[in-house]
Design a protein with these regions (language model features):
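Zn-dependent metallo-beta-lactamase
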Residues: 1-36, 47, 178-184, 198-201
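Beta-strand-turn-beta hairpins that frame and shape the catalytic cleft
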Residues: 1-3, 32-37, 119-125, 142-145
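A short catalytic or substrate-binding loop motif that flags glycine-/basic-rich loops and adjacent residues
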Residues: 21-24, 129-133
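Residue-level signal for the nucleotide or nucleotide-sugar donor/cofactor binding architecture
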Residues: 80, 124, 167-168
Length: 211
């Protein structure tokens, strides 16, 4: 698996996450498997399609090579660019978790097929990771022991849980962290922040040291 991130800088308006505007970074990921591409998430705005195009170019590819678009969850910073991406990659099959696929489809007017436990996408294992949203999914590459984490955790200076104010079910989110801590994964790639080594060990340490 070869991974090429697309980074977008977002400003959340005052009143959404508190009284003041909030700035943050979110990533989508171009995953190359030979000549085929999986796009994981689509950033927030239609204009962010150019950032995805740049990541595709770094992968030596283009929109015509996208076979699958996998959406980790329904939040708009991950799905807002979907319709524009699909307009450039109409051949791509769009996939999301069972708890989120309908929400995404209604918000974007794009058909979303459901994936879940036991499914794989070009060799990447689909892992349901509910909590942040009901249908949140991660992708695991068994060959490199890498997990694409979506918003299960962030790593901006330090490893942290997904923001509480945007987490739909805190108990499920904790159970998801425990499940990932037990998997022995080596490399973690969150949507917010930097990749980190010792993915499962680091998540276990997060659980041990913070409530």
């Amino acid at each position: 698996m070869e991974l090429f991130p697309a980074r977008a800088d977002i400003v959340m308006p005052a009143g959404v996450a508190g009284p003041d505007p909030v700035s943050f970074v979110v990533h989508a990921f171009v995953v190359r498997d030979g000549d085929d591409i999986i796009l994981v998430d689509t950033l927030q705005q239609p204009g962010h399609v150019d950032l995805i195009a740049e990541a595709l170019a770094r992968a030596g590819s283009g929109f015509e090579a996208i076979r699958y678009i996998v959406l980790t969850h329904h939040h708009p910073d991950h799905t807002g660019g979907l319709a524009e991406v699909v307009s450039r990659a109409p051949q791509a099959q769009v996939l999301g978790g069972a708890g989120d696929a309908r929400v995404i489809a209604e918000a974007t007017r794009v058909a979303v097929d459901v994936v879940g436990a036991g499914d794989s996408v070009l060799g990447l294992e689909v892992v349901p990771t509910p909590g942040h949203t009901a249908g949140h999914v991660c992708l695991v590459d068994p060959g490199s022991s890498t997990v694409l984490l979506g918003d299960v955790v962030g790593n901006i200076g330090r490893l942290e849980r997904g923001p509480a104010q945007f987490t739909e079910n805190a108990d499920q989110a904790e159970a998801t962290l425990h499940a990932l801590a037990d998997r022995g994964l080596e490399h973690g790639v969150p949507s917010h922040g930097d990749p980190f080594a010792g993915a499962s060990r680091s998540i276990a340490e997060l659980l041990r040291t913070s409530a």
